[in-house]
């Protein structure tokens, strides 16, 4: 099979799942992954025969994509904030909104850094570790801890930290049943915020392939994590300490109200105009 023949096969097989533009992008991604050919070379060598091993692997990838499996899981990695991060079925695939959360935190932390030299930061529900590792890159002198209930998720997080050569204190714990013992300057979190009653609205490709424990609240209360974060923050944030949260866009006002006792709290929209973040300052 030539490269051009595979391209036609790939698009035909995935036509019911992806638009032509999406399948073209995926084709280029996976062909580059297997052959090393960039987009120009893919066109230039369109009539070149694929190695049998590459052809077999690409056909297997096509079959996996047809099941709805996210392409990032098939690749085994994705991009976040311009950097490569490993992912698998035990962690959520990073969304663009979480990049916005990190950007928001980065701007506010830069202002706080003039007052505090060695920041202490806690990430709750770290998953693949994208948030603490990215912030460590920007604030190398900070002391960062990251908590998750899943041992397998933390294995991926540690793999990412090792890959980026960043020291993060990973903690396996159930946050909802854990008493914090230290104080922090920053608490940041993108916790499970989808209510059980919203389950039918979630795409099958998400429900079927990404960890439900990272998506859905463990109870009917979609705000359960935010309530504990608000309570813990009152006790475990240092003076001028800040909280950054990614939230359920349908529960913006309700989430913001949890931080009414803080000196400052704001509901912030994402680039799509949805209520997506809450910022609070002690």
What residue spans do the PLM features occupy?
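S-adenosylmethionine
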Residues: 141-142, 147-282
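A general structural signal marking secondary-structure boundaries and capping sites
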Residues: 34, 38, 65, 69, ...
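Short, Lys/Arg-enriched, disordered terminal segments
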Residues: 1-17, 52-53, 60, 107-120, ...
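N-terminal auxiliary segments of SAM/dcSAM-dependent transferases
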Residues: 1-75
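SAM-dependent Rossmann-like transferase core, predominantly class I methyltransferases
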Residues: 45-46, 60-139, 144, 149-159, ...
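An acidic site on a long C-lobe helix of protein kinase domains
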Residues: 54, 94-97, 225
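Generic alpha-helical secondary structure signal
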Residues: 5, 29, 97-100, 130, ...
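Generic hydrophobic alpha-helical segments
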Residues: 10, 101, 105-108, 229, ...
């Amino acid at each position: 099979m030539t490269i051009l023949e595979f391209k036609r096969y790939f698009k035909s097989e995935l036509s019911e799942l992806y638009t032509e533009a999406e399948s073209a992008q995926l084709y280029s991604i996976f062909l580059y992954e297997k052959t090393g050919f960039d987009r120009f070379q893919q066109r230039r060598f369109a009539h070149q025969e694929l190695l049998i091993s590459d052809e077999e692997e690409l056909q297997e990838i096509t079959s996996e994509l047809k099941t709805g499996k996210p392409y990032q899981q098939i690749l085994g990695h994705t991009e976040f904030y311009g950097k490569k991060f490993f992912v698998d079925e035990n962690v959520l695939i990073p969304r663009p909104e979480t990049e916005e959360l990190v950007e928001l935190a980065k701007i506010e932390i830069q202002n706080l850094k003039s007052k505090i030299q060695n920041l202490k930061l806690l990430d709750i529900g770290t998953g693949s570790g994208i948030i603490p590792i990215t912030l460590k890159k920007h604030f190398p002198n900070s002391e960062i801890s990251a908590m998750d209930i899943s041992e397998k998720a933390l294995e991926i997080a540690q793999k990412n930290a090792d890959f980026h050569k960043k020291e993060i204190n990973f903690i396996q714990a159930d946050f909802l049943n854990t008493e914090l013992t230290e104080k922090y300057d920053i608490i940041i979190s993108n916790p499970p915020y989808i209510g059980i009653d919203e389950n039918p609205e979630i795409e099958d490709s998400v429900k079927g392939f990404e960890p439900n424990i990272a998506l859905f609240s463990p109870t009917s209360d979609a705000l359960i994590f935010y309530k504990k974060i608000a309570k813990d923050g009152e006790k475990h944030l240092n003076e001028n300490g800040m909280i950054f949260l990614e939230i359920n866009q349908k529960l913006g006002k309700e989430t913001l109200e949890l931080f009414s006792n803080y000196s400052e709290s704001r509901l912030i929209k994402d680039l799509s105009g949805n209520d997506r973040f809450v910022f609070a300052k002690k």
